[in-house]
Amino acid sequence: MGFLKGKKGLIVGVANNKSIAYGIAQSCFNQGATLAFTYLNESLEKRVRPIAQELNSPYVYELDVSKEEHFKSLYNNIKQDLGSLDFIVHSVAFAPKEALEGSLLETSKSAFNTAMEISVYSLIELTNTLKPLLNNGASVLTLSYLGSTKYMAHYNVMGLAKAALESAVRYLAVDLGKHNIRVNALSAGPIRTLASSGIADFRMILKWNEINAPLRKNVSLEEVGNAGMYLLSSLSNGVSGEVHFVDAGYHVMGMGAVEEKDNKATLLWDLHKEQ
């Protein structure tokens, strides 16, 4: 018997079969969940529908989180098709490319507002819209990153957005706790995804994480997906308001091992020159 057998969940923001949302969806499906998916626009619909089909789901809905009317349509569609939900996965983040270049000082008000609206407010609006459909014991999960609390090169305004997102998780956990609904964030280590492709020097970031993380590796999509499934299932019934790291332990590190520093410096300089 799967940990999510008989449960119904909504996956918001899956982009392709390399995305973290896909890894979570696949793990939930393997544990017996019935899934529904959203897509941003017609271009991404062509990617999402095959994923939904692979995971035996006929439920695919359009959702541009910048459009209020889409939330209303989503609510009506889910109520009609599924009746209720046991979990929501929020995997939505965006900042204009120019806001990830240069320094934070150069961030425009427009780029800042866009990053906050799409990456943070969308979680609040999504949860509030679908709250009447959430069953007792339901779970809401969003995706964060270490850049929320530590400086990460080329992350800029997204670091601020992820910090705000994690704060929203804590406040939503309190607001929804009285309804026995849990809210958590999953903070994964670097993984090659469509979103990470927009970050400069990402190959170097991957290698740096691999050689400095306590487990001396980068995490896999399956590992992150299984952690997400845990936070959505009854296995984590006592967990809410948490930021759960799945990064091979990298978040605990200060400096790497002294005996390795020379090799690391040479390796990273070589990687940097290849960019």
From Swiss-Prot:
Q: Does the keyword Hydrolase apply?
A: no
Q: What InterPro entries does the entry give? A: Enoyl-ACP_Rdtase_NADH (IPR014358), NAD(P)-bd_dom_sf (IPR036291), SDR_fam (IPR002347)
Signal sequence bounds: none
- Keyword vocabulary terms for this entry: Fatty acid biosynthesis, Fatty acid metabolism, Lipid biosynthesis, Lipid metabolism, NAD, Oxidoreductase
Q: Which Gene3D superfamilies match?
A: Enoyl acyl carrier protein reductase (1.10.8.400), NAD(P)-binding Rossmann-like Domain (3.40.50.720)
A single GO BP term for this record reads: fatty acid elongation
Q: For the site Involved in acyl-ACP binding, which positions are given?
A: 203
Give, as one word, the top-level EC class: oxidoreductase
Any idea which positions bind substrate? Answer: 95
Biological or metabolic pathway of the protein: Lipid metabolism; fatty acid biosynthesis
Active-site residues (renumbered): 145, 155
Kindly list the GO molecular function terms attached to this UniProt entry: enoyl-[acyl-carrier-protein] reductase (NADH) activity; identical protein binding
Positions bound to NAD(+):
13, 19-20, 64-65, 92, 162, 191-195
Q: Which reaction does it catalyse?
A: a 2,3-saturated acyl-[ACP] + NAD(+) = a (2E)-enoyl-[ACP] + NADH + H(+)
- The answer to whether UniProt assigns keyword Oxidoreductase to this entry is yes
The EC number(s) given in the record are 1.3.1.9
| Binding partners and assembly | Homotetramer.
Q: What does this protein do?
A: Catalyzes the reduction of a carbon-carbon double bond in an enoyl moiety that is covalently linked to an acyl carrier protein (ACP). Involved in the elongation cycle of fatty acid which are used in the lipid metabolism.
Query: Which family would the database say this protein is a member of?
Result: Belongs to the short-chain dehydrogenases/reductases (SDR) family. FabI subfamily.
Protein known as: Enoyl-[acyl-carrier-protein] reductase [NADH] FabI
* Source species of the chain: Helicobacter pylori (strain J99 / ATCC 700824) (Campylobacter pylori J99)
